[in-house]
């Protein structure tokens, strides 16, 4: 289920994004990026519609995933 991120309190959204960024541990290449930079990257992707905030009823977790990946998962159900 897609969570309408614009309806969340700012602090709640920030916490969700930070949790996601810390969980992902993505390698950014030669230049390490700060937590703040990574959070802003994810926030920009949410605003642009590139990624979605998604609730998994099966796992009872919230995740951030690319829009295309969410749609592909829906087609498999």
Swiss-Prot record:
**A Pfam family the protein falls into:** UPF0270
The protein's superkingdom reads: Bacteria
Q: Which residues cross the membrane?
A: none
Q: Which family does it belong to?
A: Belongs to the UPF0270 family.
Annotated protein name in UniProt: UPF0270 protein Spro_4577
| Naturally occurring in which organism (per UniProt) | Serratia proteamaculans (strain 568)
């Amino acid at each position: 289920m897609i969570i309408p991120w614009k309806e969340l309190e700012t602090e709640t959204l920030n916490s969700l994004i930070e949790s996601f960024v810390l969980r992902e541990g993505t390698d950014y290449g030669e230049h390490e990026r700060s937590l703040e930079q990574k959070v802003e990257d994810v926030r920009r992707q949410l605003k642009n519609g590139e990624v979605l905030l998604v609730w998994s009823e099966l796992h009872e977790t919230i995740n951030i995933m690319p829009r295309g990946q969410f749609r592909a998962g829906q087609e498999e159900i």
